[in-house]
From Swiss-Prot:
UniProt: Zn(2+) 2 binding residues: 246-247, 352, 604
UniProt-annotated stretches for the region KHa: 4-71
UniProt protein name: Transcription termination factor FttA
Cross-referenced SUPFAM superfamilies: Metallo-hydrolase/oxidoreductase, Prokaryotic type KH domain (KH-domain type II)
GO molecular function, one term: RNA endonuclease activity
Amino acid sequence: MPIEDVLLDLKHKIEKNLPAGVTITDVEFEGPQLVLYTEEPRKFADDGNIIRNLAKELRTRIAMRPDPRVLATPEDSISIIEEVVPKESVISSYYFDPDSGEVIIEAEKPGLVIGKHGATLREITKQIGWIPKVVRTPPIKSRTVKNIREFMRNNLKERKEILKTVGRKIHRECTSKDQWVRVTALGGCKEVGRSCFLLSTPESRILIDCGVNVGSDENMTPYLYVPEVFPLNQIDAVIVTHAHLDHQGLVPLLFKYGYEGPVYCTPPTRDLMVLLQLDYIDVAAKEGKKIPYESGMVAKTLKHTIPLDYEEVTDIAPDIKLTFHNAGHILGSAISHFHIGDGLHNVVFTGDYKYEKTRLFDPAVNKFPRVETVISEATYGNANAFQPALKDAEKHLQMVVKNTIERGGIAVIPAFAVGRSQEVMIVLEESIRKGLIPEVPVYLDGMIWEATAIHATHPEYLNNDLRKLIFQKGQNPFLSECFKPVDSHEARQKIIQNPQPCVILATSGMMNGGPVMEYFKAFAEDPRNTLVFVGYQADGTIGRRIQKGWKEIPMTGKNGSTEMLKMNMEVQVVDGFSGHSDRRQLMEYVKRMQPRPERVFTEHGDEKACVDLASSVYKKLKIETRALTNLETVRLL
């Protein structure tokens, strides 16, 4: 059936289900949702169940757009909104978009603008006609969030056309009578880095992640040139499980070589993805490395990105529904559940996950409506890869920092900008506040402060305890005075040239570049100082070499020659802060999964870890398993 006939049929069905006196003028697909156009937005606002009931009846996401002729002026609208919304919400800005009929309201306390069960939003629509969308005013100023919001506002018309094209492709008619499901491993199997998979059916091709192996020049990119993937315009959608570069660093490259479809991720992942992609190409340029794409491709990716919240069931292809669930790995990290066909098959891609409550996040979700196949990470899949309890890890970190400070030294902590940094920040803030370690400045360098600002913008993605602390007690640990952002080369040099006892968190986490290397060069030869590892160190990185006990580290000198740097500083590995599940948690995650899966495939770990985990799941849980290898295709159904 042609798409115009599909829309006409939907319009007739909607009109039959609307209450008496409520009318629509048109319907159109915008991305995964169906948009209803009406001259009577106030009637829809009167009854909050109209849209909900239609969505349930049609089994699709529905949004409403008002006719521009029935909208109040922006000036009158602002006056009315400020009468309806409590002043305690602290509204900081408005943006009116006549094309969509939406008013974007930025407020410090979005919940007060929304009201109980959306009552205040409906009241706003009843009085002004506009559809209010609420975003949080970042409690810490974020250039990334500010620029993304401005960019999206400035490109609304183009984005609307993109969404229209995407929507029509999603809702096209299924033509194949065959029924099969396959997964192709394109990267990240029996290795850590360049994660990428293709989920295929007779109707659809979905790319899950497209990462870069930052620790390797030879095996940096996934196998995107294979016939299953290329040309890229045959892919229906790209899914990004989380914002680390080894899962999303090459998504803009897809657009450079012909991809024009949607990118699905959570809202925090979108913000962090932009931050890390721009930093990635900036660092590559400064280090004289090949730049895989320009900043314009990052912008194009952003235009095509469709953010989805957890638990939001969404059509992404004619025969596939996607639902994101909390993965507990980093901010916005998602376990991706794919419902294929009409109950034909269900696949769960875990991405990276943590099956334990941490300072930042709740444990990874492992309860689903249905699941037959699980594709699980195996970073710590080795039989002896057990991590200490988080409380023990925190005590270890406190002891290391305390001892270093008391002997007049500096604790340098290489950390990813996203995830471990914020976990460590919360522990350090509490430790200083309670007097468990001396009160010293904690310097944050290399995007860590900007990433922290994005965390503060999305508190609803943090765990319950942290949300209560922020919302109910008004205590935001990220705003502590002990944290000192390092926002320039001059500020960094001041710390290096005038060394005083302190803690330095700096990127990159594996010491393969970034400002941490400047601190390392400056402080490595002083035995009073300590290098503290709190995250995974991949093979081939300087971090892994130091962990192996190297006492002389080859470094590039000022004239480009190689110089050997003597390692006199203490080296401490504080296990337990990892955002990955350890061996015990990996096994428990599968063991406690509901319903019980039929098969489990392992990936994202070295060969021994992937094989060992797969073998143990098979032997102990009696579930079919396989350690996937790059470039192999497995039929699931």
